[in-house]
Swiss-Prot record:
<protein>
    <recommendedName>
        <fullName>Heme A synthase</fullName>
        <ecNumber>1.17.99.9</ecNumber>
    </recommendedName>
</protein>
<comment type="similarity">
    <text>Belongs to the COX15/CtaA family. Type 2 subfamily.</text>
</comment>
<comment type="function">
    <text>Catalyzes the conversion of heme O to heme A by two successive hydroxylations of the methyl group at C8. The first hydroxylation forms heme I, the second hydroxylation results in an unstable dihydroxymethyl group, which spontaneously dehydrates, resulting in the formyl group of heme A.</text>
</comment>
<keyword id="KW-0560">Oxidoreductase</keyword>
<feature type="transmembrane region" description="Helical">
    <location>
        <begin position="154"/>
        <end position="174"/>
    </location>
</feature>
<dbReference type="Pfam" id="PF02628">
    <property type="entry name" value="COX15-CtaA"/>
</dbReference>
<dbReference type="GO" id="GO:0046872">
    <property type="term" value="F:metal ion binding"/>
</dbReference>
<keyword id="KW-0812">Transmembrane</keyword>
<feature type="transmembrane region" description="Helical">
    <location>
        <begin position="118"/>
        <end position="138"/>
    </location>
</feature>
<dbReference type="GO" id="GO:0005886">
    <property type="term" value="C:plasma membrane"/>
</dbReference>
<feature type="binding site" description="axial binding residue">
    <location>
        <position position="316"/>
    </location>
    <ligand>
        <name>heme</name>
    </ligand>
</feature>
<keyword id="KW-0408">Iron</keyword>
<dbReference type="GO" id="GO:0016653">
    <property type="term" value="F:oxidoreductase activity, acting on NAD(P)H, heme protein as acceptor"/>
</dbReference>
<keyword id="KW-0472">Membrane</keyword>
<feature type="transmembrane region" description="Helical">
    <location>
        <begin position="6"/>
        <end position="26"/>
    </location>
</feature>
<dbReference type="GO" id="GO:0006784">
    <property type="term" value="P:heme A biosynthetic process"/>
</dbReference>
<feature type="transmembrane region" description="Helical">
    <location>
        <begin position="93"/>
        <end position="113"/>
    </location>
</feature>
Length: 338
């Protein structure tokens, strides 16, 4: 009964974090992230409820660079759309925090979560607070002279969310898996290493994807597999390792593509090895890996070819989390097998 409660709580928490990631991506893609120019963690739980309140919020927005340089023709109704998207994103963050924190306190003081098991939950809790600060730190970067958020802060904001999800999802499968795999006759060192490498590569790829979004790098070189006439554009070939390239949309798109090839090779190698083991659960994971990988790659290519349609781009981001989840599941089963 107690384990069932924790499983339900962790499942809901994981779903909420995924929703936060996807809605955060939509907020970025629609240019809604700078519509709320204040950070009010407690008092900002309600949207404007009258015409006058909307006028006040719109007037605040007009005082900042995004309106003056980009959206100077925006109407109040258009402002309401971007404001509500950002508001939903922030509200969902508050709800996610409550859904996580309140049961955590209850489970701990009731002794359902023991002292020996509390560490990952505390780390996730601390990261939730860091994430809230990082979100505002990111928004603040776009309220200065440049009407665009820092792509680096955006990437770290996303990665913190992914780490929180990783911790919670790992605890979820740890609570749900009562029976360990019996694979004593099989050498699992190689697939365990592949799993670790795959997780690392996907983290890097998610980080790069956030940089692409932050620099609008998906709106250039809308061709595949070449970037224009070359695999690597001549504009960056000569100074490929220059640190200034991290602010160059061409370079960022190029290494995000290269990262995609790396993900494909590592995940396919892992799936191939799992299929050779001939264990039904690991074989099932291998098929899930292949499906998630193909969905991730295909949505990425379509996103590029069609200049970042919001639905496809959001689906691409979602399948990055799905693919990561399957690999975490794989890593857990192999690591805990005997």
């Amino acid at each position: 009964m107690q384990q069932s409660l924790i499983t339900k709580w962790l499942s809901i928490s994981c779903i909420m974090v995924i929703a936060m990631i996807v809605i955060g991506g939509i907020t970025r893609l629609t240019g809604s992230g700078l519509s709320i120019v204040e950070w009010r963690p407690i008092t900002g739980i309600l949207p404007p409820l009258s015409f006058e309140a909307w006028q006040v919020e719109f007037a605040k927005y007009k005082a900042f660079p995004e309106y003056n340089y980009v959206n100077y023709r925006m109407t109040l109704s258009q402002f309401k759309f971007i404001y509500l998207l950002e508001f939903i994103h922030r509200l969902l963050g508050r709800i996610t925090a409550l859904i996580y924190i309140v049961p955590l306190i209850y489970f701990y003081f009731k002794g359902i979560i023991k002292n020996r098991d509390i560490a990952p939950y505390i780390i996730a809790l601390l990261l939730l607070y860091v994430q809230g600060f990082m979100g505002w730190y990111m928004v603040k970067s776009g309220l200065l002279n440049n009407p665009s958020v820092s792509h680096l802060r955006l990437a770290f904001h996303l990665i913190i969310a992914v780490i929180i999800y990783h911790i919670l999802f790992y605890q979820l499968i740890k609570n749900r898996c009562d029976i360990l795999l019996i694979l004593s006759q099989t050498d699992l060192k190689l697939p365990l290493r592949f799993s670790s490498v795959a997780i690392t590569v996907i983290y890097l790829q998610i980080f790069l994807g956030a940089l692409v979004a932050g620099l609008d790098a998906g709106l250039i070189y809308n061709s595949f597999p070449l970037m224009g006439d070359n695999f690597i554009p001549t504009a960056i070939k000569d100074n490929f390792f220059d640190l200034k390239n991290w602010y160059d949309p061409v370079f960022i798109q190029c290494i995000h593509r290269l990262g995609g090839y790396s993900v494909f090779l590592v995940v396919m190698a892992l799936a191939t090895y799992l299929l050779k083991i001939e264990h039904p659960k690991l074989n099932k994971i291998a098929y899930f890996l292949i499906i998630a990988l193909l969905m991730q790659i295909s949505t990425g290519i379509i996103t590029l070819l069609y200049s970042v349609p919001i639905i496809i781009a959001s689906t691409h981001q979602f399948f990055a989390i799905v693919l990561l989840s399957v690999i975490i599941w794989c890593y857990f089963l192999i690591k805990t097998s005997k």
